[in-house]
């Protein structure tokens, strides 16, 4: 009788539902590597203003799946000039907060809206004042500061690996090349604890 009861409890436990791993718990951390396009789709043409970006970040999760984010990014866009283009590169560090506004019960797919503050340096034409046709640039570099708003998603492929996608609008001041940049891209997040 006792064996039969244990067998029934075991069968019920296995058939009632599936147990999911615990994700996005407070104090969990993840390292993210991300790449994407900035200000449109970069096609390598000299007439295109679009560019690309790459970044490395650390996420620290809080209650409800929200997260604090810290990271560094390199973004390069181009300013068309006659038959060439002027590269504009921004190297920034940022920190921010992202709120989990939608997720499934198993925390496999999560959506975030977030904001961050950033500061860094912008370089025009890699610091060279003179262009190939003899024209002179007024500014070749500047310290920049600002922030961003973003919409992100995380799709967990396993307990320790997630695919990420994001759309971000950066707004920076301190430069003379434009204050707003739109970024969209993908990344991989590795949960480290």
Each model region followed by its residue ranges:
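Short glycine/proline- and aromatic-enriched beta-strand/turn motifs that initiate or cap beta-hairpins
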Residues: 20-71, 75, 185, 189-193
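Outer-membrane pore/translocation modules
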Residues: 23-50, 101, 105, 115, ...
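Residues that define the transmembrane beta-barrel architecture of outer-membrane proteins
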Residues: 27-31, 48-54, 85-93, 109, ...
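Membrane-spanning beta-strand positions in outer-membrane beta-barrel proteins
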Residues: 30, 67-69, 110-112, 156, ...
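Extracellular loop and loop/strand-boundary signature of outer-membrane beta-barrel proteins
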Residues: 41-44, 79-86, 133-139, 171-175
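Gram-negative (and chloroplast) outer-membrane scaffold detector with strong preference
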Residues: 57-132, 190-193
């Amino acid at each position: 009788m006792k064996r039969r009861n244990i067998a029934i409890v075991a069968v019920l436990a296995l058939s009632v539902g599936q147990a999911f791993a615990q994700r996005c718990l407070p104090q969990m951390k993840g390292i993210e590597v991300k790449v994407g396009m900035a200000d449109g789709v970069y096609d390598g043409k000299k007439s295109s203003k679009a560019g690309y970006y790459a970044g490395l970040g650390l996420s620290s999760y809080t209650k409800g799946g929200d997260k604090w984010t810290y990271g560094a990014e390199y973004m390069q866009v181009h300013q068309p000039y006659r038959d060439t283009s002027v590269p504009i590169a921004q190297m920034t560090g940022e920190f921010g907060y992202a709120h989990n506004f939608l997720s499934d019960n198993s925390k496999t797919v999560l959506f975030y809206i977030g904001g961050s503050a950033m500061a860094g340096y912008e370089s025009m034409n890699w610091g060279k004042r003179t262009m190939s046709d003899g024209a002179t640039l007024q500014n070749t570099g500047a310290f920049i500061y600002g922030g961003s708003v973003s919409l992100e998603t995380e799709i967990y492929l396993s307990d320790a690996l997630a695919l990420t996608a994001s759309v971000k609008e950066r707004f920076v001041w301190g430069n003379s090349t434009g204050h707003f940049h739109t970024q969209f891209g993908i990344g991989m997040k590795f949960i480290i604890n």
